[in-house]
């Protein structure tokens, strides 16, 4: 969850953080090792009609279900953001654990806004080189085509 820039449920807040900013603040302030796969990253890794068609052509239930979900979300994305693509939010978070080399990261100090009238639920990411106590590895880029290929392949052949 989170974002170094714009949100998706408000102009500044990403849904998961916005839904319970106090809990998110507790986690981000806990001192445990954190990696954030925010909207700034996941919006770089998208699937469109070619990937949906590839998955639809597969005979596996996983690919069929994935294609249906992607088709629905692509329509939603078109209606709300003007882009007929699906951002790969959760798959990026999972793939970072199993294939971390596919992602670039930057250490940042991340705080959660819990009181702002217009910014409640915002992840405040200090991207300055001299940031005080960077405490979170924030994913900033991805080998997008490789990530998308791995997701499609996993849907077509879940044993791969």
Show which residues each predicted segment covers.
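Active-site histidine-anchored catalytic micro-motif
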Residues: 1-43
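Conformational coupling and interaction surfaces
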Residues: 18, 22, 37-160
């Amino acid at each position: 969850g989170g974002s170094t820039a714009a949100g998706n449920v408000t102009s500044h807040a990403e849904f998961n953080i916005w839904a319970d900013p106090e809990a998110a603040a507790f986690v981000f302030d806990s001192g445990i090792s954190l990696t954030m796969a925010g909207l700034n990253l996941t919006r770089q890794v998208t699937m469109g009609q070619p990937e949906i068609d590839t998955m639809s052509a597969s005979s596996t239930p996983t690919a069929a279900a994935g294609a249906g979900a992607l088709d629905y979300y692509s329509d939603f994305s078109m209606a709300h953001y003007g882009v007929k693509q699906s951002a790969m939010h959760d798959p990026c978070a999972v793939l970072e654990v199993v294939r971390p080399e596919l992602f670039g990261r930057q250490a940042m100090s991340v705080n959660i806004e819990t009181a702002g009238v217009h910014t409640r639920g915002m992840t405040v990411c200090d991207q300055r080189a001299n940031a005080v106590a960077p405490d979170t590895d924030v994913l900033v880029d991805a080998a997008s085509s490789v990530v998308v290929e791995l997701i499609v392949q996993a849907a077509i052949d879940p044993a791969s």
